[in-house]
Amino acid sequence: MSVLLNRDVLTSKIAEALKAGKPRRFRQSVELIVVLRELDLSKPENRINLLVELPHPPKANKIAAFAHGVFEVNAKNAGVDAIITRDQIESLSGNKRAIRKLAKQYDFFIAPPDLMPLLGRVVGPIFGPRGKMPEVVPPNVDVKSVVERLRRSVRVRIRNEPVIKVRVGAEGQDQKEILANILTVLEEINRKFSLKQYLKEIYVKKTMGPPIKIRAVEVLSR
């Protein structure tokens, strides 16, 4: 079910967040923080881990493929940023520092089904808690379409606290595009948890800027 959101309030708060804080020597991201209430996180179904494709991604995500054989060829043709072979996966075994570095280096990973047991054993303990486990691409699925979708996607995740943090824009980006990204994320959250029931508050902020608070009553149209 769709939810009506007050676009004027969101637009005003986006503008306020972009103006707030000191100038930095780098292009800051615009972040959306959604705080939910009365959510029972002892229930596994409430600890979500979703991918949401943004209409206007602030940057193209970096994608790496764990690959071999035909899948390696298809991943290269799809334009992934890096190929990690079976031998390279096995060489990572026990090297926690290298695995952590790899997890930070790329936004998303893809892999064929037959490599998942090895990946679960080698990188799973570090990738899993970080939400970086590879997206499994079955043999009958077009690798290029998966890569293109991941380039535009953000991860919407709830683990131990009822809080979702997502990058929805960047300094210099059209504010209408940032608004469209925020609305897309909120609609996706609403599919899982009714915002009218569970939303407590929202914050919009730059990477190094102060959070601009939006109360649920302000953003939920009546």
UniProtKB/Swiss-Prot annotation:
Pfam families: Ribosomal_L1
Keywords, in A-Z order: Repressor, Ribonucleoprotein, Ribosomal protein, RNA-binding, rRNA-binding, Translation regulation, tRNA-binding
GO molecular function: rRNA binding; structural constituent of ribosome; tRNA binding
Cystine connections: none
A GO cellular component annotation in the UniProt record: large ribosomal subunit
Domain of life: Archaea
GO biological process: regulation of translation; translation
Keyword Isomerase in annotation: no
Protein role: Binds directly to 23S rRNA. Probably involved in E site tRNA release.
Stated family: Belongs to the universal ribosomal protein uL1 family.
Subunit structure: Part of the 50S ribosomal subunit.
Name this polypeptide is given: Large ribosomal subunit protein uL1
Organism: Pyrobaculum arsenaticum (strain DSM 13514 / JCM 11321 / PZ6)
